[in-house]
Amino acid sequence: MVLNSASKSAWNSTSGRSGAVVLLSGGMDSCVCAVLAARDDRAAAVHVSYGQRTEARERRSFESICDRLGIRDRLLVRNEALQAIGGSALTDASIAVPEVGAIGTGAPGAVPVGVPVTYVPFRNAHFLAVAVSWAEVLGAEKVYIGAVEPDSSGYPDCRPEYYRAFNEVVKAGTKEGAIRVVTPLIAMHKHEIVTLGLELGAPFDLTWSCYQCEERACGVCDSCVLRLRAFHEAGAEDPIPYAAAAARLR
């Protein structure tokens, strides 16, 4: 664990702004959340590494986004339990990351229906536990997470009812019960998130979404295809590099 943070007293001395902790993976959804948090509150950012395939690249995106947004208070956490538990293509090298066909090619290329093998079992609960714990120490009132239900991969921990239930846990399990987990993007389609991010000046060029590559995004995993489709539907150019084979998707 690496902590670069002001003390609670220094945090609370900031004039007139409430505090928020944002979970920042380095992807485009969490980046837009970080922009919203930094705009509306004094923001601190948490990044959790859990043995995922693109761990180093995601951490680099986290640091770069924080630098661009001026977020100084950062917490880097390594969760070894999720990798040890396995059960996901993101954490288990023996499970292949599925490749999705090109945009607009019909059913064979569609994003899979149901919970895919890239789902990391109960991952967001681990992330939220860290963020809420830190928010309680800092005296922050909100925890931002970039969960999205429409146009997502069908992950069960990205549903509104999950966050309603989690907020009840936070209310019952923290000293003052005043921390709220907020999900400003949860009802938005991916292309709407791209449009919002562009309006807010979100640094999409610093983000990373690919599940399996760290130098050039593969363009064919579930996450890449959802991202490419979102930029296409928003009428915008995705600023990150893709492998040559993925150029046909753009």
Regions found by a protein language model. Name each.
Residues T174, H232-G235:
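Short amphipathic alpha-helical interaction/hinge segments
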